C-alpha cells in the first residue's frame, strides 16, 4: 500500500497526511497553470479548492476517533443499563410494598368497621337502657362490662397487627439493602477473579515456554552425550587395532621402544579424552549432576520471573487504585475550542506567497526548489490538531 498514491486509496482508508498529499498535488497543478496562463486564471478558483480540502481534512479527522472515547461510550451505556436495572428493581420493591400496604389497609378497615359496628351496638343498647325505667340488675351490668372488655381486646389486636406489619416492612427493607450489598460484592469478586485468571494464564504461558526450553536442552545434552560415546567407542576400536598391529611385529628393540611410545601416546589421548581420574583439577560432577544443576537454575529463573510479574501486577493495581477519581464520568468541557488555522490554508497561503515572488525569480528552477522546501516544511511542522491526532494513531 506504500506505492499507492493518496488519490488511488479507498475513501475509508484516507488519513490527514493523505489529504495533505492531495493538496500538494493540486498545488503542483496550479503551479503549471500559473506558469502557462498567469495567476488571474485561478484567482477565483483557488479559495474554493482550499475550502473543499479543509472540509475533506475535517471529515477524515472525524473518522479517526480516539478509541478511548469509544470505550467511555461503551462504559456509559453499561452504566445506563445498570441504572435501568436498579430502577426496575426499586419499582418492583415499591409495588410489593404497595401490595403489603393495601393488605394492611384492608385489614385495618375491616377492624375499624367492626369497631364502628360495635360502637353503634353499644349506643343502641345505651339508648334502650335509658328509655327503660327498669333498674339494671347485676347480670345486665356484667354484660355491659363484657362488651367494653371486648372492644378493648379488638383494639389491642388491631394494634398488634399494625406493629407486626410495620416490623415486616422494615425487615423487607433490610433484606433488600443486604441483597444490594451482596450483588456489589459479587461484582467486585468477579472483576478480581478475571484479573487473577489473566495472571494465571500469563504464568501458564511462561511455564510452557520454559518447559519447551528445558526439553530442547535435554535433547541437546542427550545428542551431545551420544556423540561423545560414539567417539569414545571409535577411539577404543582404533587403540585395539594398534595394539594388535604392534603385537604382530617383533623387530628390533628400537622398534619395540617406538611401539611402546606409540601405545603410550594412544593411551594418553584416550585418557585425555575420557578425563584422567587421577587429575586433581578434573570436574567433580557427573552428567546427571550437571543436569540437576541446570534444572535447578531454570527453576530459580522461573521463580524469579514469576515474582517479578507478581510485583509488577501489584504495583499496577496500586497505581490504578491511587488514580481512581471520585466522579464516575468525565466532565465535558463546555468551552468551545479556539479555532486554529487549517493546514490546507497554510499550505495554499505559503503557495500564494511563493507565487508572488515568482516574477522576480526564474520561473521553473526556483519555483521547484521553493515548492520542494515548502512540502518538506509542511510535512514536518505545519499540522493541525486533527493531523497530529491522526499521526498518533497511525
From Swiss-Prot:
One of the record's GO molecular function terms: dynein light intermediate chain binding
Intracellular or extracellular location(s): Cytoplasm, Cytosol; Cytoplasm, Cytoskeleton, Microtubule organizing center, Centrosome; Cell projection, Cilium
Keyword Chloroplast annotated: no
Keywords carried by this UniProt record: Cell projection, Cilium, Coiled coil, Cytoplasm, Cytoskeleton, Protein transport, Transport
Domain RH1: 2-89
Coiled coil: 68-327
Source organism, top-level taxon: Eukaryota
A cellular component term, taken from the record's GO annotations: centrosome
GO biological process, one term: cilium assembly
Domain RH2: 282-347
Similarity field: Belongs to the RILPL family.
Job of this protein: Plays a role in the regulation of cell shape and polarity. Plays a role in cellular protein transport, including protein transport away from primary cilia. Neuroprotective protein.
Entry protein name: RILP-like protein 1
Species the sequence originates in: Xenopus laevis (African clawed frog)
Organism placement in taxonomy: Eukaryota, Metazoa, Chordata, Craniata, Vertebrata
Amino acid at each position: 500500500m506504500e506505492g499507492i498514491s493518496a488519490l488511488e486509496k479507498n475513501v475509508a482508508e484516507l488519513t490527514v497526511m493523505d489529504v495533505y498529499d492531495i493538496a500538494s498535488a493540486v498545488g503542483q497543478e496550479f503551479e503549471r497553470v500559473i506558469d502557462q496562463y498567469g495567476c488571474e486564471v485561478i484567482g477565483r478558483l483557488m479559495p474554493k479548492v482550499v475550502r473543499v480540502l479543509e472540509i475533506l481534512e475535517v471529515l477524515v479527522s472525524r473518522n479517526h476517533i480516539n478509541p478511548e472515547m469509544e470505550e467511555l461510550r461503551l462504559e456509559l451505556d453499561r452504566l445506563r443499563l445498570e441504572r435501568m436495572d436498579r430502577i426496575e428493581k426499586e419499582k418492583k420493591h415499591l409495588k410489593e410494598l404497595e401490595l403489603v400496604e393495601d393488605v394492611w389497609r384492608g385489614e385495618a378497615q375491616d377492624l375499624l368497621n367492626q369497631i364502628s359496628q360495635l360502637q353503634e351496638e353499644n349506643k343502641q343498647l345505651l339508648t334502650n337502657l335509658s328509655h327503660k325505667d327498669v333498674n339494671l340488675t347485676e347480670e345486665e351490668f356484667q354484660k355491659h362490662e363484657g362488651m367494653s372488655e371486648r372492644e378493648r381486646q379488638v383494639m389491642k389486636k388491631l394494634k398488634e397487627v399494625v406493629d407486626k406489619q410495620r416490623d415486616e416492612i422494615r425487615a423487607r427493607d433490610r433484606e433488600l439493602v443486604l441483597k444490594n450489598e451482596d450483588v456489589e460484592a459479587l461484582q467486585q469478586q468477579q472483576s478480581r477473579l478475571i484479573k487473577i485468571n489473566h495472571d494465571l494464564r500469563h504464568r501458564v504461558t511462561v511455564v510452557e515456554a520454559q518447559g519447551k526450553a528445558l526439553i530442547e536442552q535435554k535433547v541437546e545434552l542427550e545428542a551431545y552425550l551420544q556423540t561423545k560415546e560414539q567417539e569414545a567407542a571409535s577411539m577404543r576400536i582404533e587403540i585395539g587395532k594398534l595394539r594388535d598391529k604392534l603385537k604382530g611385529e617383533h623387530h628390533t628393540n628400537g622398534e619395540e621402544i617406538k611401539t611402546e611410545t606409540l601405545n603410550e601416546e594412544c593411551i594418553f589421548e584416550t585418557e585425555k579424552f575420557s578425563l584422567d581420574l587421577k587429575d586433581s583439577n578434573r570436574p567433580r560432577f557427573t552428567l546427571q549432576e550437571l543436569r540437576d544443576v541446570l534444572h535447578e537454575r531454570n527453576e530459580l529463573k522461573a521463580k524469579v520471573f514469576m515474582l517479578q510479574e507478581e510485583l509488577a501486577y501489584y504495583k499496577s493495581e496500586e497505581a490504578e487504585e491511587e488514580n481512581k477519581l471520585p466522579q464516575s464520568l468525565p466532565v465535558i468541557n463546555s468551552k468551545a475550542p479556539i479555532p486554529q488555522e487549517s493546514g490546507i490554508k497554510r499550505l495554499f497561503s505559503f503557495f500564494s506567497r511563493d507565487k508572488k515572488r515568482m516574477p522576480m525569480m526564474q520561473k521553473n528552477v526556483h519555483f521547484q526548489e521553493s515548492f520542494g522546501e515548502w512540502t518538506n516544511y509542511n510535512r514536518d511542522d505545519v499540522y493541525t490538531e486533527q493531523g497530529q491526532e491522526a499521526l498518533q494513531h497511525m
